[in-house]
Amino acid sequence: MDAKLSPEQGLNISGIALASLLAVGLGTTAFFLDSMANRLPWQSMSLTLPLLLCAMGSGVVGFWVIPLLQALKTGQIIREDGPQAHLKKAGTPTMGGIFFIPVGVIIACILSNFATDVLAVSALTTSYGFIGWLDDWQILRRKSNKGISPRTKLALQVGFAAVFCLWLMFNQPSNITNIALPWVSFTLPLGFLFWPLAGFVLVAESNATNLTDGIDGLAAGTVAIALLALGALIAPTAPGLMVFCAALSGGCLGFLAHNRNPARVFMGDTGSLALGGALAAVALLTNTLVALFILSGIFFVETLSVMAQVSYYKATKGPDGKGKRLFKMAPLHHHLELTGWSELQVVGVFYVIAAILAAICLA
């Protein structure tokens, strides 16, 4: 695709229309998948009911919480060296994860009859949301883009990941350390090596979704697609976690009603870290790491763009202390913006890619 695509060319759609298309698409998909699996869409153990309940619940709660966030002066601090179009977003409330993550988690626990697996994943999700909240709060308190130190954030992420892995170790079958490879009848026995991999996946996935949250509606929409697909994939073997995935996907859709372009609220690290942790925890618990890797394609590309940018800059640094850049700005979505894409073009194309990746996993 031509990187110099102008905002007036190609995708010409409003933020509310794009969000509505996604909501209708995911709702229809959930209904279709339930019907194909002989699940009644209005049953608690389905994809459709949790999706719709949480979409409506988080959407309604947002109308109450957003004015409260505004009153508490939780306005986002915008980087001056970022895309100039983002400067007008200064003051938009952040920390929106505090309302849609709890809605998804609570409804998932209720509909699943407080299944042990759902409670464990909910605890991990909430814990990562707490890390994000600490970071968001420090940024707001200091009125800068510096939250808690990277070392502190990483230590907390690793710590909560270790607790979750210990729970897995003592409460799940020993064959959880065997990685199933889809499309072939083969499993990869990792043994003890599974546990450092599990910790890495939890930390990496949460940070990857965090990096993707840089444009109105981008993270909420792409994660909603990934969660629904993951829920559909694990439905036959883990119905409780299917409900959890559908509920959190619905929570993202309800949040998207307020976060679509132009956004009235941002999810902040409170939301993005929690969502990444949720995806990783479900995948570890259901032996779907390969599917997670595919579903998270956008998040990983965004992360790789940052890693490549930093590495190349350091490798080409001259005597003046300045290096060269591979991208105009990282992550990738900001590079596309600076080459002429509008926010809605980036979001629309990323939604389509996320949907294609989901279809590949469900094929």
Curated annotation (Swiss-Prot):
Q: Which PROSITE patterns match?
A: MRAY_1, MRAY_2
Its GO CC terms are: plasma membrane
Query: Could you tell me the superkingdom of the organism this chain comes from?
Result: Bacteria
Biochemical pathway: Cell wall biogenesis; peptidoglycan biosynthesis
Instruction: Indicate whether Metal-binding appears among the record's keywords.
Output: yes
Q: Which GO terms describe its molecular function?
A: metal ion binding; phospho-N-acetylmuramoyl-pentapeptide-transferase activity; UDP-N-acetylmuramoyl-L-alanyl-D-glutamyl-meso-2,6-diaminopimelyl-D-alanyl-D-alanine:undecaprenyl-phosphate transferase activity
Principal cellular location given in the protein's record: membrane
Question: What GO terms in the biological process aspect are recorded for it?
Answer: cell division; cell wall organization; peptidoglycan biosynthetic process; regulation of cell shape
- Quickly give the catalysed reaction: UDP-N-acetyl-alpha-D-muramoyl-L-alanyl-gamma-D-glutamyl-meso-2,6-diaminopimeloyl-D-alanyl-D-alanine + di-trans,octa-cis-undecaprenyl phosphate = di-trans,octa-cis-undecaprenyl diphospho-N-acetyl-alpha-D-muramoyl-L-alanyl-D-glutamyl-meso-2,6-diaminopimeloyl-D-alanyl-D-alanine + UMP
Give the transmembrane region(s). 13-33, 49-69, 95-115, 119-139, 154-174, 183-203, 224-244, 281-301, 343-363
Q: How does it sit in the membrane?
A: Multi-pass membrane protein
Q: Where is this protein localized, as stated in its record? A: Cell inner membrane
Supply the InterPro entries for this chain: Glycosyl_transferase_4, PNAcMuramoyl-5peptid_Trfase, PNAcMuramoyl-5peptid_Trfase_CS
Q: What is its EC number?
A: 2.7.8.13
> Which cofactors are reported in the record for this sequence?
Mg(2+)
Assigned keywords, A-Z: Cell cycle, Cell division, Cell inner membrane, Cell membrane, Cell shape, Cell wall biogenesis/degradation, Magnesium, Membrane, Metal-binding, Peptidoglycan synthesis, Transferase, Transmembrane, Transmembrane helix
**Disulfide feature:** none
Question: What is this protein for, i.e. what is its function?
Answer: Catalyzes the initial step of the lipid cycle reactions in the biosynthesis of the cell wall peptidoglycan: transfers peptidoglycan precursor phospho-MurNAc-pentapeptide from UDP-MurNAc-pentapeptide onto the lipid carrier undecaprenyl phosphate, yielding undecaprenyl-pyrophosphoryl-MurNAc-pentapeptide, known as lipid I.
The family annotation for this protein states: Belongs to the glycosyltransferase 4 family. MraY subfamily.
- What protein does this entry describe? Phospho-N-acetylmuramoyl-pentapeptide-transferase
